[in-house]
Each structure stands twice: as C-alpha cells, then as structure tokens.
Amino acid sequence: MAAADVEYRCFVGGLAWATNNETLEQAFANFGQVIDSKVITDRETGRSRGFGFVTFSSEQSMLDAIENMNGKELDGRNITVNQAQSRGGGGGGGGYGGGGGGYGGREGGGYGGGGGGYGGRREGGGGYGGGGYGGGGGGYGGREGGGGYGGGGGYGGNRGDSGGNWRN
C-alpha cells in the first residue's frame, strides 16, 4: 500500500442508538484532525447498528484516541475503540464492499475479508479480523449464525440468543 493510501481509522463499538456521525466526531476531535466519522446504520431500518468508524489525519491522533477512549462512556454507553482493519482490495469474495460480502454485505465476505464480518447477513464465519468480533459465525451484527458480539446471532441479530437483541 502506498503511503498516500494509509488510513488512520478506528473502529468504535458499543455505540448508543442515539449516537450519530456528528456526536461521534465531536467525541474524538480532541485527539486530532478527524477526516471522517461514520456511524453504520441498517440499510432497511436506518437505525444505528451500534458501531462506527473515525478516520484521523495522523497515526498519533488515532493512537491517542484508542488509548484514551477505549472503555470510556459516550452517550451513556461504554465504548470499545480499536484500530480498524485495512479495507483490503474491495473485490472478490471479501474486502470492503467487494464481491459476495464486504462491509454490510449479505453473503459472507465481511470487512477486510473472511466469512461473515461486519454486517454479513448469511452464513458468516468470520467477522472483524477474520475470527469474528467475539468469535463464532455471523460476526458483529450478523443475522444468521452463532457467535458474534453477544453470542448467538450477533449484536442485535435476528436469530439465536444474542443478549443484545433490541427487537425482543
């Protein structure tokens, strides 16, 4: 990856439903110039999926944000802040939005490849970084499959015993 392509991006998990792009940016602006902040929403309902990304202009800003914000409270919820995976190639069966999966994809894939992933909706086995945020199939936000954040069907998932299922 060329130096110009380097992104200093944080994954932010455990967001309150009320947190939006602006409040996310404001919470992280103290650590340096925020290039982008994005709360990921469900395409069908428009509701927050409980996680997002913040991109900084420098590596030091990103590292400071991770160190100082991980485990802290934002809008009444304790958040998780980690360095985000690279977007990868964006094509084929994985990658960010590529092929049969990708970020928010429906058929495996996942953020940065693997099976399942962030927003993967079917037959997910991977998730964030390949092993699932919390392990198992489905990953963070997965709808079909076990594991994921909260176990069962993922954070707010439709199947399994998620513990974080806001649909009741």
UniProtKB/Swiss-Prot annotation:
Keywords: RNA-binding
PROSITE patterns to which the protein is assigned, alphabetical: RRM
Region of interest (Disordered), ranges: 148-168
CDD domains assigned: RRM2_NsCP33_like (cd21608)
Residue intervals of the RRM domain: 8-86
InterPro entries: Nucleotide-bd_a/b_plait_sf, RBD_domain_sf, RRM2_NsCP33-like, RRM_dom, SLIRP/GR-RBP-like
Function of the molecule: Possibly has a role in RNA transcription or processing during stress.
Name by which UniProt lists this protein: Glycine-rich RNA-binding protein 2
Lineage: Eukaryota, Viridiplantae, Streptophyta, Embryophyta, Tracheophyta
